[in-house]
């Protein structure tokens, strides 16, 4: 009888465990199905439910971690993606799954790349590559090479965006990163060609062409994009075909073959309309407008820019609308229609002010100044002078769009300026601002505001008081003046480090302080007594060593809490059997821990700490109707050369070495430009 009861209990336990396992696996499979169908948000819910149920199967749990990380990546929740890929890496490493470790390292690298942590991403992707080569996994090796190319490509682009540099003109570190991307893409291309993977070849050709384009290797870019176009046509991939046409147009622009570029842009426009992608259609119109501007066919340029403007208004893209107004102003100026040019320059100024685009605002002011100089009008630096009796084509009518998301006219100028002109415009037109110089007396105020603390004076002693519950704290005037002799640079940085340590104590853990005279053992935001300081004693405290010991202990415990262990891996149900297996793997593994693996862990922990301590960088936003690969530099050079050809070489009077002012210079050039623009208008 007793044996039967024991047998029944074992059977019941087996069935319960089987049902739980089936439930976890079924939830995970449903989550995978939903993600594959494109509903990643619903898929995440099922994966999270599977984690809540838990499983003893370590490989199943690793697969769930990987899928969850990928789903969160697709949903742009990169912090969650990083967390689950990190769990996946830890678990794969623990159970000795090298293939899983390679894939997890690659996924971590892709996530870190998107977060802008390129050096950490390179370490992870290199780990992926090393393991794949060790296992002779050609497919994994190809993916790792492609990922490394992507990371170096993104790194180069991120460094190469400080200003309106010409394509191919980069600092040495940017060029090195882009060249490394080319090398990895070419290795990837050779490998996927040997494997016969045509789809992967298409991706490699596309990225290789884009990287050559950035490096200024436009012939190589054309060759790569032509191959990308052929493969896209093989697969019937209209979106990839459209991108290839657009990239070919961009490359031919910089090769000076504008007619060829216009043909590719027209094919891009046709495919965009077939795909019913209004934003891409607007981008194509914008590119065609600029191309016909370079061809000096201003009537066609205006036609395409008006189409771009109409779609930008339809899509509420203020960035694109401002860019269209800038282009239309240039085209109308070239035709000698200064009234229309004035109107669009004013619209450009209005939009630049609205979106807070200072460079675009300066450009619009310069355009208005030149136009008004030609028309003999006076120019006000404070208000835009709206031109009168200006009739606008009916196709421009539309609802005023909402505020755009990003600055569109970064560091842009319409024409080349003399140093004198730039200097005068900077001083006369731009708003005057006082330089922001941190005075010694302001350093404590800065730290004080940063920490949410304030100073209170009790006789001669200044003690940091807790002000965490108040919204704004201002220091009385009598307490703001602190001489530079009282607190020097070393004192300031010492005080800053103490404030930071106090902030860490408040937010992160409860310190078990040694030799502490306070009775309370709970976390307190009030600083210890060693933080007390008088104005007559040095800032450095005799208890610095004790404080640093406490700080090191706090940090080490916090890092230990964050590191993944088997007890805090979500979804892992440990039984006696699995616990013994894990213990055996941890204690009896004779293989020394790989330094690269720990390097990855440390870098990932650093990324997590950085994410927790500071706000993430602002998301890169862009106008949907403006192409990513814009060729403003070529347009500006063309405009500048045209202006230079029209201008006269002024003979400087020996007796007037510096009397010839900016006003005289602008007036002479404006009159000449007015005459020449009239001739061009007559020719057209």
From Swiss-Prot:
Principal subcellular localization: cytoplasm
Q: Does the keyword Repressor apply?
A: no
What are the ranges of the TPR repeats?
Answer: 24-57, 62-95, 102-135, 142-184, 202-235, 242-275, 282-315, 322-355
The record, for InterPro entries, names: GoLoco_motif, GPSM, TPR-like_helical_dom_sf, TPR_rpt
Reported tissue expression: Ubiquitously expressed.
List, alphabetically, the GO terms of the cellular component aspect: cell cortex; cell cortex region; centrosome; cytoplasm; cytosol; lateral cell cortex; lateral plasma membrane; mitotic spindle pole
Family annotation (SUPFAM superfamilies): TPR-like
Which keywords belong to this entry? Cell cycle, Cell division, Cell membrane, Cytoplasm, Cytoskeleton, Deafness, Membrane, Mitosis, Nucleotide-binding, Phosphoprotein, Repeat, TPR repeat, Transport
Give the start-end ranges of region Important for interaction with NUMA1. 22-357
Binding of GDP occurs at: 608, 613, 642, 647
User: What PROSITE patterns has UniProt attached to this entry?
Assistant: GOLOCO, TPR, TPR_REGION
Question: Pfam families in the record, alphabetically?
Answer: GoLoco (PF02188), TPR_10 (PF13374), TPR_12 (PF13424), TPR_7 (PF13176), TPR_8 (PF13181)
Q: Please name the disease the record associates with this protein.
A: Chudley-McCullough syndrome: An autosomal recessive neurologic disorder characterized by early-onset sensorineural deafness and specific brain anomalies on MRI, including hypoplasia of the corpus callosum, enlarged cysterna magna with mild focal cerebellar dysplasia, and nodular heterotopia. Some patients have hydrocephalus. Psychomotor development is normal.
Which function does this protein serve? Answer: Plays an important role in mitotic spindle pole organization via its interaction with NUMA1. Required for cortical dynein-dynactin complex recruitment during metaphase. Plays a role in metaphase spindle orientation. Also plays an important role in asymmetric cell divisions. Has guanine nucleotide dissociation inhibitor (GDI) activity towards G(i) alpha proteins, such as GNAI1 and GNAI3, and thereby regulates their activity.
Q: What is its quaternary makeup?
A: Interacts with the dynein-dynactin complex; this interaction is inhibited in a PLK1-dependent manner. Part of a spindle orientation complex at least composed of GNAI1, GPSM2 and NUMA1. Interacts with LLGL2. Interacts (via TPR repeat region) with INSC/inscuteable. Interacts (via TPR repeat region) with NUMA1 (via C-terminus); this interaction is direct, inhibited in a PLK1-dependent manner, prevents the binding of NUMA1 with SPAG5 and promotes spindle pole organization. INSC and NUMA1 compete for the same binding site, but INSC has higher affinity and can displace NUMA1 (in vitro).
From the Swiss-Prot or TrEMBL record, give the protein name.
Answer: G-protein-signaling modulator 2
What is this protein's gene name? GPSM2
